[in-house]
């Protein structure tokens, strides 16, 4: 009774000490503490298993300890599978703390393999996890057991580390490159080889225990040892394509194992993947740049061919792709540049998102013969050439039909309004004429760089009352062309002259009507482009 009083006083004193305010731990601290506890528990279980195995080996060497060895064999067999489950891959080791067992392998910013605890610590504090806590004892205890893991490591190194994997995002599961340590297909190969090595050791150790005279061990070892050996000796192969290398094994509707590629293909398309799509190299994504990637001999060739999507090669590859894309898109406008009369051979090389390179210096020069051309066939090709010039630079952006008026975007007033404001109405027109003054005049003989507006086209329909001769399909002629027919009325035969003038006038009106229809179609195309 008196002995229990101090314990009760200690229990009553606990709430008083807990009244002291404490800082609440953050989520990162809780995760790091949980990982530390799990890693410490895994280390203690590994040490306990190691001590049990050493004690069993020592007792098995003594002649008089057969009965005690057979009695303790069952607990060791029960605890060994748990230690095998803790060690996910025997070929890995944390580059920071050196541990070989972790629930999740991570990668450091340099590409090295680290355990889950070191990865969470680095993610939370941006500092490498300190390793001088209890590592001296664990390192001293972990040095004796490598006979079991050395065989597995040797088999994995012989089968995977000296492989022919090209690296750089293309993997064939054999290893041998710089970044193969974290490849899922390579990890699967290591896991299979490690399982086979462990099963072989367990079977040999089971046969060694079977020679003991204890009957209980002879009954247990034949039942437990051959099962993992049979399961590990059979490699898993895809039911569809037959491959044995894949980053993730899946199952079809019947439960057969299939590779990741066949499973995704069936999930997306609803049918099995054709066998001719099978490839010997697996292309995987590079989320983290592996260490010393630039020193890999295959990095340059793979990045130039486009098979690798590594982050360090992405800027050059993207720039090269943009250059090729622009070169392909600008192949058609290059022909138009060579066909331009005032264009030199060196066409401007602009960025793909820059304004279209257009030379406006030869635009007015090429459009001058429209008003002063001697014949009709000379004016039509010029008009078509100007229209082709208008929509040729824009064709690389997907616009195929653009009228010539889109070249001069600023448009505030029509040419007819500008002409009426600049010059008064000429006195040479007939009294009964209701038409507007001509667009071109002697003061401004050079025509503008674009066609007239819709209002000027519609107002030109009253041109029937003007007795003038015009043989080109360009704009209405200047004043000196309209003044030229003035000396013709005082002719000896006015009837024949009027008949000839009516025929010429009819032909001229038909040509002008066709010209106005063409201009109206151009305006309609321009309006259609503006509505888009």
UniProtKB/Swiss-Prot annotation:
Residues 56-87, 131-153, 202-227, 291-318, 422-506 are annotated as: Disordered. SUPFAM superfamilies: Glucocorticoid receptor-like (DNA-binding domain). Keywords: DNA-binding, Metal-binding, Nucleus, Repeat, Transcription, Transcription regulation, Zinc, Zinc-finger. A zinc finger (GATA-type) spans 94-118, 238-262. One of its GO terms (biological process) is positive regulation of transcription by RNA polymerase II. The keyword Repeat applies. GO terms for cellular component: nucleus. It is found in: Nucleus. GO terms for molecular function: DNA-binding transcription factor activity, RNA polymerase II-specific; RNA polymerase II cis-regulatory region sequence-specific DNA binding; zinc ion binding. Its main location: nucleus. It comes from the Eukaryota. Residues 59-87, 295-312, 430-444, 452-462 have a biased composition (Polar residues). PANTHER family: BOX A-BINDING FACTOR-RELATED, TRANSCRIPTION FACTOR GATA FAMILY MEMBER. This is GATA factor SREP. It comes from Penicillium chrysogenum (Penicillium notatum). The lineage of its organism: Eukaryota, Fungi, Dikarya, Ascomycota, Pezizomycotina. The gene is SREP.
